[in-house]
Swiss-Prot record:
Entries under Pfam families matching the protein: LRR_1, LRR_8
LRR repeats: 72-93, 95-116, 118-139, 141-163, 164-185, 187-208, 210-231, 233-254, 265-287
Gene3D superfamilies: Ribonuclease Inhibitor (3.80.10.10)
One BP annotation, GO: intracellular signal transduction
Coiled coil (UniProt feature): none
Keywords linked to the UniProt accession: Leucine-rich repeat, Repeat
Name the record gives this protein: Leucine-rich repeat-containing protein 30
Native species: Homo sapiens
Length: 301
């Protein structure tokens, strides 16, 4: 019996010692690789199409230096850390296709981002950016750019050169107007400018002939511009929570809007929480077909 208790006691102590050791030896994956003499490249994940490396939610305040030697990396995820600076050495990662910097504390991006000539997707949302370097416009392959939840009020005019950009998120910033360079992005299919300080939508919006999703909710927009009705490719138009009082008779031209939408994810026209007087809110609630009919009749009377 005593021997059993002794063995049981020994078993109880074993895991506790292991747990204690685990806490003391809790190395990050890259530290573990370096301490064991392994090549950091062994941490790379090789998928069918991309070589990726992830350091998500590590509590990092600095990026480990060895990373800049991993020239093979094509997808790099550094999101949800506490990074305050992206060093210029990022320019060494010339094969990067996807770079995720979401959820850090970055106040700026280095000019060396211009060296990332393969970059197609860049997430810098949920940071502290007050400006974006003009050099980013040299990343001519860029297709997706998220700058939401920052402190931006303008974009460099040369962003008009991002001719392949298809999705742009500028929501939750301090824009008083949509930057003019945006209206030169002919391939844009998604534009989110919600929760800014917009009071109007420029007539130039009509130049975005490929736009399918336009979100401008949560601003202080006073009028629904007729030029927006010329963007006939729109499938989702969200103008919720603004100061719009009337709808243009040309609204029926947006024939790809299939319904009055209430769920934020649904395609259609989102126009709730506006002080509509003409047409009456009750008419809007009757559905898009009734609304279009009313606006057409109004136009011919």
């Amino acid at each position: 019996m005593g021997a059993r208790q002794s063995r049981a006691s020994s078993k109880d102590k074993g895991p506790k010692r292991m747990l204690f050791t685990g806490r003391r030896q809790k190395f990050s994956p890259w530290d573990d690789a370096l301490l064991s003499g392994r090549d950091p490249r062994s941490l790379l994940k090789r998928g069918m199409h991309h070589v990726s490396f992830s350091l998500v939610t590590r509590g990092m305040t600095d990026i480990p230096d060895f990373l800049w030697g991993l020239s093979e990396v094509q997808k790099l995820n550094l999101s949800h850390n506490q990074l305050r600076v992206l060093p210029p050495e990022v320019g060494k990662l010339t094969r990067i296709v996807v770079l995720n910097l979401c959820g850090n504390r970055l106040k700026s991006l280095p000019r060396e981002v211009s060296l990332l000539q393969c970059l197609k997707v860049l997430f810098v949302n949920m940071n502290c950016l007050t400006e974006v370097p003009a050099e980013l416009s040299l990343c001519r392959k860029l297709e997706v750019l998220s700058l939401s939840h920052n402190c931006l009020s303008q974009l460099p005019a040369c962003f008009a050169d991002l001719s392949r950009l298809r999705k742009l998120n500028l929501s939750n910033n301090f824009f008083a107007h949509i930057p003019m360079c945006v209206f030169s992005l002919k391939e844009l299919i998604f534009l989110h400018v919600g929760s800014n300080r917009l009071e109007n939508i420029a007539e130039s919006i009509q130049h975005l002939a490929s736009l399918q999703i336009f979100i401008a909710e949560g601003n202080n927009i006073h009028s629904f511009p007729r030029s927006l009705c010329l963007v006939t490719s729109l499938e989702l138009l969200n103008l919720n929570n603004n100061d719009i009082q009337t709808l243009p008779s040309e609204l029926h031209l947006l024939c790809r809007l299939v319904r009055i939408a209430w769920n934020p994810m649904d395609k259609g026209l989102h126009i709730s929480h506006n002080p509509l007087s003409k047409p009456l809110p009750e008419l809007v609630e009757g559905g898009l077909e009734m609304l279009f009919g009313y606006l057409k009749d109004k136009k011919h009377t």
